[in-house]
């Protein structure tokens, strides 16, 4: 017996119904205010679905509004836009919502091209033709299969493990655990399962896979139980670095609603993920002990950190649906910036938060240098290049110690994590202030 279809909680917007009757051959600049506003609002909500911040969404909506000779004001959050368009005589107000949020740089890049070329190409098209073009852009889903995204998470978390102090055994176990965990997460997302279920199951599966591999190693290879330290690294693919960082950028531009909503979304993911990992640790008798010490010459440390940082950023970039050339660009920037951050801490005893600020500032400046040559939005390069600096290990250890009522230790880990999380968007913000005059002023 077939299951009844699940009724959608958010109804689909039939965009072509907003076009004027008999307006197929009329340029959109001569269309009604309703038709113009439908183009502006649809582009805005599509940009928002790609994960970009409120300032960028509003800027793009303004570009289209100016080209069509209307005025647009917009209030933008994480999942919705309320906007009004004026043409000097009438006003049109609409509220648009997303069903889910995520990151899709491939779609974002196509939308950026659409906006850049609108003045020369889009103004001559009819509203119906523009909606047809937006239909084709909206169909751009993930570039990669769940298997490929699982491998990307495995590469990222394997590199992450080394940067946190893990050795080959921890890296291999985290590689397998993260790969399986993110594969499951992608399959659940593809079938539209709710956010909480996806987080709990994927994190639990990653931790279980790590623990299972380690137990096999203990039985057959007589591995030390201290290698359990890396189980945290198997779940770091879930850390929401993108909304964490974009929330800081939005708050810097006083887009309070978007910034607070993005921060709240990131905190929800952190809370559910760390609680799931903590419960799995209790069930599997795992503890976040220190990694076994690795002794290497300074030159080897630097080279291996460059390589591990490259792998980590490359993997996260693929998870954010970036094309391979763009992922490589972000990985090169991230390798330089993150290695600089780590060496500042190790060689001259820089406070970790200050080093994180300099690392993020470096990433932002490097991204600005290649922005025009790369032809991609700046955020597509800057955010992935510093996501690897988000202190997921600190956040988990803070929650783990909170769970066992070691409150002083928990506060120490949380304080360290908060300082670094604050420093990362500040570094990108100051890089943007230094290199982008449109961002420098309050407009």
Spans of model-derived segments:
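Alpha-helical membrane-inserting segments
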Residues: 159-164, 180-188, 205, 209-217, ...
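Short juxtamembrane and helix-loop transition motifs at transmembrane-helix boundaries
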Residues: 128-141, 155-166, 185-193, 284-297, ...
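Membrane-interface helix termini and inter-helical loops of multi-pass transporters
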Residues: 217-226, 284-299, 401-412
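Soluble N-terminal domains of membrane-associated systems
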Residues: 1-132, 136-138, 142
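C-terminal transmembrane helix-loop-helix hairpin of multi-pass membrane proteins
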Residues: 230-235, 246-250, 254-270, 332-443
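Structural signature of hydrophobic alpha-helical transmembrane segments
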Residues: 161-177, 226-240, 292-308, 348-362, ...
């Amino acid at each position: 017996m077939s299951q009844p279809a699940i009724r959608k909680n958010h109804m689909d917007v039939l965009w072509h119904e907003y076009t004027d009757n008999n307006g197929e051959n009329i340029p959109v600049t001569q269309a009604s205010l309703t038709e113009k506003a439908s183009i502006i609002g649809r582009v805005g909500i599509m940009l928002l679905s790609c994960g970009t911040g409120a300032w960028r969404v509003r800027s793009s909506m303004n570009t289209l509004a100016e080209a069509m000779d209307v005025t647009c004001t917009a209030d933008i959050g994480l999942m919705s836009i309320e906007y009004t368009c004026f043409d000097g005589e009438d006003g049109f107000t609409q509220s648009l919502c997303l069903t889910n949020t995520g990151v899709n740089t491939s779609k974002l890049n196509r939308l950026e091209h659409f906006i850049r070329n609108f003045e020369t190409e889009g103004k001559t098209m009819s509203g119906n033709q523009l909606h047809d073009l937006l239909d084709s852009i909206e169909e751009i889903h993930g570039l990669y299969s769940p298997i490929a995204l699982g491998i990307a998470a495995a590469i990222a978390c394997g590199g992450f493990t080394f940067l946190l102090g893990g050795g080959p055994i921890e890296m291999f176990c985290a590689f397998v655990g993260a790969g399986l965990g993110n594969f499951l997460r992608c399959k659940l997302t593809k079938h539209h399962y709710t956010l909480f279920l996806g987080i709990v199951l994927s994190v639990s599966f990653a931790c279980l896979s790590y623990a299972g591999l380690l137990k096999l190693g203990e039985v057959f290879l007589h591995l030390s139980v201290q290698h359990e330290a890396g189980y945290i690294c198997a779940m770091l693919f879930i850390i929401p670095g993108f909304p964490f960082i974009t929330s800081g950028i939005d708050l810097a531009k006083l887009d309070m609603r978007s910034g607070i909503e993005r921060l709240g979304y990131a905190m929800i993911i952190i809370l559910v993920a760390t609680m799931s990992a903590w419960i799995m640790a209790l069930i599997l008798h795992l503890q976040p002990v220190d990694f076994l010490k690795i002794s290497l010459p300074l030159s080897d440390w630097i080279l291996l950190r460059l390589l591990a940082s490259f792998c980590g950023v490359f993997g996260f970039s693929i998870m954010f649906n970036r094309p391979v050339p763009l992922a490589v660009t972000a990985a090169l920037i991230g390798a330089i910036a993150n290695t600089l951050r780590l060496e500042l801490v190790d060689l001259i005893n820089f406070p970790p938060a200050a080093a994180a600020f300099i690392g993020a500032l470096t990433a932002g400046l490097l991204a600005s240098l290649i922005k025009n040559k790369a032809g991609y939005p700046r955020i597509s390069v800057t955010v992935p290049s510093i996501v690897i600096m988000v202190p997921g290990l600190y956040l988990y250890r803070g929650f783990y110690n909170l769970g066992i009522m070691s409150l002083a230790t928990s506060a120490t880990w949380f304080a360290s994590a908060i300082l670094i999380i604050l420093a990362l968007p500040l570094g990108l913000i100051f890089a943007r202030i230094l290199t982008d005059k449109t961002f420098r002023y309050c407009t």
